[in-house]
């Protein structure tokens, strides 16, 4: 079979204006970024139509290090639904350069279920990540200048919370010292870099309702504390207007096309392990405005992405999914059954049977939110019929709909079985009104306990001294009603990435809590998770090149 980029290049794209027209988007409200990409003015969102659309979340069991194909299934399902006559748009996150050149590769789908042009989407796209990175680091520069200019007059800060960001994986930048050298180089202080998808600016962009809300949230970003323990925000710095200007164009959702020329929105890109893991509210609502069915995905496993989708995104956006699709692979189930990563492609029915406990736990958790769930088996060429049949039978015994997805090899035709199951399930048994994992009024400790104990399976919650201090600050500053966003490993229900399966009765250690007052959420850092990833021993960058003007190795 051809590589992803070979398939992408073999498809003759249609002009984005044609995609817009066929979708019902007025072309006078799009701004072209070349022939095949456009931004759509957020004024085109119609809240009445949003409430009429069928929103479907695609999530997954705990993934392998190579991922699980959730984006491919999301795109494939959209193709399949369009194939059976249901007007459908997929709304996805933008890829980050970090994993694109690091371990996972790109995030534009795969095979014959991709969003196009995949090379541009995976690389610089419309410059949204550049704008977010620039806006974040502009705040850093302006804050450092404020500290320098006020170094002798008592108006400086006792504590600086704001770090920098960069859209690459670079472990050496996690902790740095700035302002070294002569005094004219600024105040010497400890700092560090997070990856751009973990930026609070990214979260704000994805949660903002409009430009006015964007500015309000930027004003509220907490930068540090004064010497008399008062919070110091971007509003105090006086630069909210300038930062909003940098993000003005980035706020508009990006319109592209699938491998079968149907519309797709790709906008925003927070990771689900270190951020809230969902594309922008504006892009999702735009898709819902112009479609009868909207497919969206949330990053990594359901313990991370789906929980945050329900408890943060849906809560803020006022939307409820009619159905959740849980993506499963035989490879991941075998890993959870004790097979090492290098042997998960080999048939092993006994290991798969053991690993099904991970799927069952995710199913139980999704039902905790009142969701009707169907299982999409994302098929690989090395899956045996016995493995597929076992999972199908297991799901049938549990009363869960099951369909095989072959969109990677067959495009929309390979997702018709899944599409028909989705439509039938929504018509006969749609999800109940969303039941959140916690209430806004719950204390922060209660919120953490409800997610960690009820969903992850923890038996005890412990806090570092730094986290305990933050809990006190949160109450004093009036941030206690914010939802929580737990940052932890994506490879386990626990905080230990080496413990697979359906682990229970473990200690859940809260290392720190980051107060994202602009995004209006509390990032709870658990275990040893890093908000700036490192590169693997053999990064994807080693396989990417340009030959005769054509990009090779991008996936």
Curated annotation (Swiss-Prot):
Question: Which Gene3D superfamilies does the UniProt record give?
Answer: Domain 2, N(10)-formyltetrahydrofolate synthetase, Formyltetrahydrofolate synthetase, domain 3, P-loop containing nucleotide triphosphate hydrolases
List the InterPro entries hit by this protein, alphabetically: Formate_THF_ligase, Formate_THF_ligase_CS, P-loop_NTPase
Keywords of this entry: ATP-binding, Ligase, Nucleotide-binding, One-carbon metabolism
Could you say which residues bind ATP here? 64-71
Q: Which CDD domains match?
A: FTHFS (cd00477)
GO terms assigned for molecular function: ATP binding; formate-tetrahydrofolate ligase activity
| Reactions catalysed according to its record | (6S)-5,6,7,8-tetrahydrofolate + formate + ATP = (6R)-10-formyltetrahydrofolate + ADP + phosphate
Q: Name one GO biological process term.
A: tetrahydrofolate interconversion
Is the Mitochondrion keyword given for this protein?
Answer: no
Keyword ATP-binding listed? The answer is yes
Q: Name one Pfam family in it.
A: FTHFS
Instruction: Specify the pathway.
Output: One-carbon metabolism; tetrahydrofolate interconversion
- Under which EC number(s) is this enzyme classified? 6.3.4.3
Per the record, the similarity remark reads: Belongs to the formate--tetrahydrofolate ligase family.
Q: What is this protein called?
A: Formate--tetrahydrofolate ligase
Gene name of the encoded protein: fhs
């Amino acid at each position: 079979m051809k590589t992803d980029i070979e398939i992408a290049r073999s498809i003759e794209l249609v002009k984005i204006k044609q995609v817009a027209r066929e979708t019902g988007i007025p072309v006078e409200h799009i701004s072209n970024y070349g022939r095949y990409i456009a931004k759509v003015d957020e004024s085109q969102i119609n809240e009445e139509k949003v409430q009429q659309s069928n929103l479907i979340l695609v999530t997954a069991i705990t993934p392998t290090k190579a991922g699980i194909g959730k984006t491919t299934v999301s795109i494939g399902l959209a193709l399949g639904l369009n194939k059976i006559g249901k007007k459908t748009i997929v709304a996805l996150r933008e890829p980050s350069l970090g994993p694109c050149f690091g371990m996972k590769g790109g995030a534009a789908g795969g095979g014959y279920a991709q969003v196009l042009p995949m090379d541009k989407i995976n690389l610089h796209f419309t410059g949204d990540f550049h704008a977010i990175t620039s806006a974040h680091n502009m705040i850093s520069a302006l804050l450092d200048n404020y500290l320098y200019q006020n170094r002798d007059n008592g108006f400086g800060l006792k504590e600086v919370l704001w770090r920098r960001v960069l859209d690459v994986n670079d472990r050496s930048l996690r902790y740095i010292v700035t302002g070294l050298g002569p005094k004219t180089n600024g105040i010497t202080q400890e700092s560090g870099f997070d990856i751009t998808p973990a930026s609070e600016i990214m979260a704000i962009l994805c949660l903002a309702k409009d430009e006015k809300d964007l500015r309000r949230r930027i004003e509220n970003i907490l930068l540090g504390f004064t010497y008399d323990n008062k919070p110091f925000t971007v509003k105090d710095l006086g630069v909210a207007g300038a930062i909003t200007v940098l993000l003005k164009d980035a706020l508009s959702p990006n319109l592209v096309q699938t491998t079968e020329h149907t519309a797709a929105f790709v906008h925003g890109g927070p990771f689900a392990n270190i951020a809230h893991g969902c594309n922008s509210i504006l892009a999702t609502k735009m898709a819902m405005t112009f479609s009868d069915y909207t497919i969206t995905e949330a990053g990594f496993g359901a313990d991370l992405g789906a929980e945050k989708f329900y408890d943060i995104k849906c809560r803020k956006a006022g939307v409820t999914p009619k159905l959740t699709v849980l993506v499963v692979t035989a490879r991941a189930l075998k890993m959870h059954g004790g097979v090492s990563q290098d042997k998960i492609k080999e048939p092993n029915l006994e290991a798969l049977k053991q690993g099904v406990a991970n799927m069952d736990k995710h199913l139980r958790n999704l039902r905790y939110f009142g969701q009707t769930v169907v299982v999409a088996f994302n098929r690989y060429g090395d899956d045996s019929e016995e493995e597929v049949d076992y999972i199908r039978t297991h799901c049938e015994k549990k009363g869960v709909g099951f369909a095989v997805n072959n969109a990677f090899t067959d495009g929309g035709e390979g997702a018709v079985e899944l599409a028909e199951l989705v439509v039938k399930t929504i018509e006969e048994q749609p999800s109940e009104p969303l039941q959140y994992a916690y209430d806004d009024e719950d204390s922060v400790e209660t919120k953490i306990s409800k997610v960690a104990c009820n969903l992850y399976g923890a038996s005890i919650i412990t806090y570092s001294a730094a986290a305990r201090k933050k809990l006190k600050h949160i109450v004093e500053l009036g941030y206690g009603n914010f939802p929580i966003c737990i940052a932890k490993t994506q490879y386990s229900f626990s905080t230990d990435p080496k413990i697979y399966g359906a682990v229970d009765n473990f200690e859940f250690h809260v290392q720190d809590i980051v107060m994202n007052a602009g995004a209006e959420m509390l990032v709870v850092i658990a275990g040893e998770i890093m908000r700036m990833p490192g590169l693997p021993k053999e990064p994807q960058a080693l396989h990417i090149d340009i030959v005769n003007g054509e990009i090779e190795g991008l996936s």
